[in-house]
């Protein structure tokens, strides 16, 4: 059950990342890397305010990053992110 909830949240996260508004053409055609562009944090929370069994420490806060060059230590790949026409790796811990 917990796995199903986690996978559902990741699918919703992927849809949300793809639903970002389209940026101006000038911004999309830039090829130089901007400071902080590689790491974009996303936080996902499970459960309701009253608390449920799903609010364990391991599921309470899932932090994901869209990275250009692969996942860092203690992170695992959960798919891909797309921002404009660029593809990134979705890394979560």
UniProtKB/Swiss-Prot annotation:
According to its UniProt entry, this protein's organism is: Mus musculus (Mouse)
Q: Where in the cell is it found?
A: Secreted
Q: Which residues form the signal peptide?
A: 1-19
Please give the GO cellular component terms listed in this UniProt entry. Answer: extracellular space
Q: Name one Pfam family in it.
A: Defensin_propep
> Quick one: where's region Disordered?
22-54
**Keyword hit for Signal:** yes
Q: What's the protein called, per UniProt?
A: Alpha-defensin 13
An individual GO BP term: defense response to bacterium
PROSITE patterns, A to Z: DEFENSIN (PS00269)
Q: Which residues cross the membrane?
A: none
Q: Which UniProt keywords apply?
A: Antibiotic, Antimicrobial, Defensin, Disulfide bond, Secreted, Signal
Propeptide residues per the UniProt entry: 20-58
Q: Which cysteines are joined by disulfide bonds?
A: 64-92, 66-81, 71-91
Q: Which family does it belong to?
A: Belongs to the alpha-defensin family.
Q: What is its main location?
A: secreted
């Amino acid at each position: 059950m917990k796995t199903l909830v986690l996978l559902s949240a990741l699918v919703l996260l992927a849809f949300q990342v793809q639903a970002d508004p389209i940026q101006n053409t000038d911004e999309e055609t830039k090829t130089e890397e901007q400071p902080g562009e590689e790491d974009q944090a996303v936080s996902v929370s499970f459960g309701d305010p009253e608390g449920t069994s799903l609010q364990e420490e391991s599921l309470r806060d899932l932090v994901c990053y869209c990275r250009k060059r692969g996942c860092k230590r203690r992170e695992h790949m959960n798919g891909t992110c797309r921002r404009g026409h660029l593809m990134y790796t979705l890394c979560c811990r």
